[in-house]
Amino acid sequence: YSLALRRTGCEVVRFALKQEENFDLRENFLPFLAREKIDALFLCNPNNPTGVVYDEATIKAMAAILEKKEKEFGTSIVLISDEPYRELAYDGAVVPYVTKYYRNTVVCYSYSKSLSLPGERIGYLVIPSEMDESANVFQAATIANRVLGCVNAPSLMQRVIKRCIHEKVNLEAYDRNRNLLYSSLCEYGFSCIKPEGAFYMWVKSPDEDEDRFVEQAKKYHLIL
């Protein structure tokens, strides 16, 4: 995303979340957001790669800040909510529908993740009619999709999805793997936040020397 944005003259601002804060947005990111002047905000929920699910309270607080900043600067701020892992949430975690709380939201969704169809590049955008200049946003998304080409799903897969649209992946299998990996990694001295969603773990090695860690992995013929 960063490269494409910079090519159009955009400035990309990154914010590093901290593992010791459980990658939570409320502690430091929301105050940071309240100070920044932005045109758009990109959010991945559940998060890739930490697996954190941002709850309703966090989304509401974020929406309130964005609405306040829209009034302050007299301009629209677009929240791009990337939600390809929406159905992959564990332990009762609920992924909020951001469009309920913030009008100028575009939602990105991918069946490649929710139905375990990697590489098929098929999904959809939600562009609410309530958002500012929704018709222009829709047209821009349509043109961008045609120009990129690489993300155009073939007609066969579009027909397949039509028949599978209400299907779900085996969440129990993902959850079983999540629990096994988490407990095993912690047992061997690694540290990570147990993911609430998606199928990733953001793991910190017990050895902070990267080169030494790689050499140890090579001894056991591991590909990381």
Question: Model-found features: residue ranges?
Answer:
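PLP-dependent class I/II
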Residues: Y1-L224
